[in-house]
From Swiss-Prot:
GO terms for cellular component: cytoplasm. Specifically methylates the guanosine in position 1516 of 16S rRNA. Gene3D superfamilies: Vaccinia Virus protein VP39 (3.40.50.150). Pfam families: SAM_MT. Keywords: Cytoplasm, Methyltransferase, rRNA processing, S-adenosyl-L-methionine, Transferase. It is an enzyme of class 2 (transferase). GO terms for molecular function: rRNA (guanine-N2-)-methyltransferase activity. It comes from the Bacteria. This is Ribosomal RNA small subunit methyltransferase J.
Length: 218
């Protein structure tokens, strides 16, 4: 629950940062698209193993991907469902985006072995920064609600064992690699985060992404 005197956590796909990126066209240059291998005319099947606020999943769906969102927190799952319903009712365009999104409540470690996709994305709760004021309020509220992700290494191992062609880990730009997780095939850096891309045997024939390690929008 949010602490007294603080705004309650809400998920909004119509306004805010998500709406701005879609309206301005900024979404098309997002580093996540390059990390996942999104390209014009290429409709990917994506599993978002850590749905959270749902922004990355909505971005991918807005670019044409079919996205399965997995969220283990019942409270966050309910907020996501409300946000998606509001977006669906807002306009035909947003309803089309929502139609490409499937929301599941559960633990991705248990669900990933039962699913198949082109890409699995993992965006765990990031380590707390020393200067906590730099963390956006909504992320503080989310952390207060769901806590840390002490099992992120287990989740990554489940993702790397999934039936998919690549796994994309979203991680703070200058954070140390996750202990016990193999070295990524390559990295794509944003302003504050990086995308560690693991190309798996199913996707081994894919060429190294052009401009890997280049800075794009986070």
């Amino acid at each position: 629950m949010a602490a007294a005197g603080r705004s309650a956590l809400a998920i909004d796909f119509v306004g805010g940062a998500v709406g701005y990126k879609l309206r301005s066209g900024a979404a098309r240059s997002h580093a996540l698209l390059k990390a996942t291998g999104m390209a014009p005319g290429r409709a990917l099947q994506v599993i978002d193993a850590t749905a959270g606020l749902g922004r990355d999943a909505f971005l991918l769906a807005s670019m044409g991907a079919s996205v399965t969102l997995i969220e283990r927190s019942p409270q966050v799952h309910a907020l996501l469902a409300q946000g998606l319903a509001a977006a669906q009712a807002e306009s035909a365009e947003l309803a089309g985006v929502v139609a490409r999104m499937t929301l599941i409540q559960g633990d991705a470690r248990d669900l990933l072995p039962t699913l198949q996709a082109d890409v699995v994305t993992v965006d765990p709760m990031h380590p707390e920064r020393t200067k906590t004021a730099l963390v956006k309020q909504e992320m503080r509220l989310l952390r207060d609600l769901v806590g840390a992700d002490p099992d992120v290494c287990e989740l990554m191992q489940a993702a790397l064992s999934a039936r998919c062609g690549r796994v994309v880990l979203k991680w703070p730009l200058r954070a140390e690699p996750l202990a016990g997780v193999r070295k990524p095939s390559y990295q794509i850096a944003g302003k504050t985060v990086r995308y560690d891309v693991f190309v798996l045997p199913r996707g081994a024939a894919e060429e190294r992404a052009p401009g890997a390690d280049a800075a794009l929008n986070p």
